[in-house]
Amino acid sequence: MRIMVAMSGGVDSSVVAARLVAEGHEVVGATLQLYDSRESARKGACCAGRDIHDARRVADRLGIPHYVIDAETRFRQSVIETFADAYAGGETPVPCVACNQGVKFTDLLGIARDLGAEAMATGHYVRRIEGPDGAELHRPVDEGRDQSWFLFATTRQQLEFLRFPLGDMPDKAAVRAEAERFGLSVAAKPDSQDLCFVPDGSYARVVEALRPEMAGEGEIVDGSGRVVGRHDGVTRFTVGQSRRLGDAAMRDGARQMVVGIDPASRRVVIGPRTGSAVRDLSLRDMNWLIDPPEGDLRCLVQIRAREAARPATVRRTADGASVTLDEAAMPAPGQACVLYDGSRVLGGGFIRRREMAGAAA
């Protein structure tokens, strides 16, 4: 089988390529260039200049062709600009979902088809299982590296074409050991950290550089609109956060947290967790990996990347879905809400922003 491997230059995708070559497949490697080469050597980024070099070294070692795809403009428009716009709208976005669904699983997958590939493989930690109604997306064996939450927007058609060979690996140590057995130069290469386009972990700095109107101090207010403090920029906050509140962090003997953000007025609304948590969510941009349910769907939902899934009832609506959690939580607008049945991903969408009392100036 002719298979394209999306090679990031890291150990995971390199092992995928090596394993497929060893299995006798006709393998083609491809790496996305997401940044200008003069800016792409920053530590902790993926798809940067050093990573392209590492991917090419691995491809040479394996004796496979390797292509570098210039995706800088597309990445900036569909991922970075969208990320900044979401923050400007008071949301906490998940740019990795946009990157996977757009640049990788639409653009790169299309190139794979153009090159005559019958499948595209990646180093993601998820499992693709053939079910009675086609390919299913599942959590990996190594749940500590589970990336299924970030891949919920993968369509059923894309899933038929994709392969995830690392989904059954027990842990990262086993992947590195396999890389050493194949003699790959990246066997000990560190994992990429944080968002690839945020070199120092400061989301606020990136957003404020792209949207200067977002910079500047503002008010911290309670649910009634009363000013209880000041902050150094709304881009530094997300719903559910309790850090950076200063003297407003404790009120009336209760620990406070962010319950709403209004970028237009630069107001951060705070309140105690008790009384601020919600059970009802509204989702937009739904992607279903099953036939959409006609009635109530009982399932587990995960509302943050590193939170445990929780029981809920989901209902399809004309413009997305509604979710009723069994127990109240603090969902952040713009984050993904992914639906699970055990290990299987059923679909998901993005949490809509709610109007908050106290936000208006």
UniProtKB/Swiss-Prot annotation:
Reaction it catalyzes: S-sulfanyl-L-cysteinyl-[protein] + uridine(34) in tRNA + AH2 + ATP = 2-thiouridine(34) in tRNA + L-cysteinyl-[protein] + A + AMP + diphosphate + H(+)
Keyword match Cell division: no
CDD domains xrefs: MnmA_TRMU-like
Record-level GO cellular component terms: cytoplasm
Region called Interaction with tRNA, residue ranges: 145-147
Superkingdom of the organism of origin: Bacteria
Signal sequence bounds: none
Keyword terms, alphabetized: ATP-binding, Cytoplasm, Disulfide bond, Nucleotide-binding, RNA-binding, Transferase, tRNA processing, tRNA-binding
Active-site residues annotated for this sequence: C99, C196
E.C. designation(s): 2.8.1.13
Site residues by UniProt (Interaction with tRNA): H124, Q335
Pfam families: tRNA_Me_trans, tRNA_Me_trans_C, tRNA_Me_trans_M
Enzyme class: transferase
Residue sites binding ATP per the record: A6, M7, S8, G9, G10, V11, D12, S13, L32, G123
Intracellular or extracellular location(s): Cytoplasm
GO BP annotations, alphabetical order: tRNA wobble position uridine thiolation
HAMAP family assigned to the protein according to its UniProt record, in alphabetical order: tRNA_thiouridyl_MnmA (MF_00144)
Physiological role: Catalyzes the 2-thiolation of uridine at the wobble position (U34) of tRNA, leading to the formation of s(2)U34.
PANTHER family on file: MITOCHONDRIAL TRNA-SPECIFIC 2-THIOURIDYLASE 1, TRNA 5-METHYLAMINOMETHYL-2-THIOURIDYLATE -METHYLTRANSFERASE
Family classification: Belongs to the MnmA/TRMU family.
Name assigned to this protein: tRNA-specific 2-thiouridylase MnmA
Species assigned in the record: Gluconacetobacter diazotrophicus (strain ATCC 49037 / DSM 5601 / CCUG 37298 / CIP 103539 / LMG 7603 / PAl5)
